[in-house]
Amino acid sequence: MRLKHFKTFLFITMAIIVIGTGCANKKKKKDEYNKPAIFWYQGILREILFANLETADNYYSSLQSEHINSPLVPEAMLALGQAHMKKKEYVLASFYFDEYIKRFGTKDNVDYLTFLKLQSHYYAFKNHSKDQEFISNSIVSLGEFIEKYPNSRYRPYVEYMQIKFILGQNELNRAIANVYKKRHKPEGVKRYLERIDETLEKETKPKPSHMPWYVLIFDW
């Protein structure tokens, strides 16, 4: 009987705490507007520190809408871009870097910012290893960087990423050719094998990508 009363008491206590916390949060959210830029910026950094990136993104939206010309806006963009990349949220990382380039890019920083954007694509590569369009677009963007910023300190890193993407494209083309081979379509086999960069293959001698056995069973 005592146990039953204790459970009832515990349930009521927890309910009061939940309701009280909810009310406090609502009041807190209600009061969070028309704040100085530093308030939102510090909130962004705090939420990044605790890996609450969704809240950090919301704080950025408030900073952006209430203080569009604040010098803290570009700082927040960079911080959020790097935080999302660290958390492997590469699409969001690329978004922040791209927005920074469009709004605050200068001849002194645009190569670095473009490099960060390309780096987010590179890290996202394993999630898009069978996305022909993603790979092709990334190779083009990497080539444009090399052409546009031949003397950039980041060029060697971009060239490395470009090689990795081309090798990935080679592997994808070989896999697609194999599909056509299984379907007895020699024209398709020929078309995709011709797209392989044989020179790069000979120079780098890449190892096939590791693929778990449970993926291999259903692959292609």
Swiss-Prot record:
PROSITE patterns, alphabetized: PROKAR_LIPOPROTEIN
Coiled-coil regions, chain positions: none
Cited Pfam families: YfiO
GO cellular component term, pick one: Bam protein complex
Subunit structure: Part of the Bam complex.
Signal sequence annotation: 1-22
Record lipid sites (S-diacylglycerol cysteine): C23
Keywords assigned by UniProt, alphabetized: Cell outer membrane, Lipoprotein, Membrane, Palmitate, Signal
N-palmitoyl cysteine-type lipidated residues: C23
Known function: Part of the outer membrane protein assembly complex, which is involved in assembly and insertion of beta-barrel proteins into the outer membrane.
UniProt protein name: Outer membrane protein assembly factor BamD
InterPro entries the record matches: BamD (IPR017689), BamD-like (IPR039565), TPR-like_helical_dom_sf (IPR011990)
Family assignment from sequence similarity: Belongs to the BamD family.
Intracellular or extracellular location(s): Cell outer membrane
Organism: Helicobacter pylori (strain ATCC 700392 / 26695) (Campylobacter pylori)
Membrane topology: Lipid-anchor
GO biological process: protein insertion into membrane
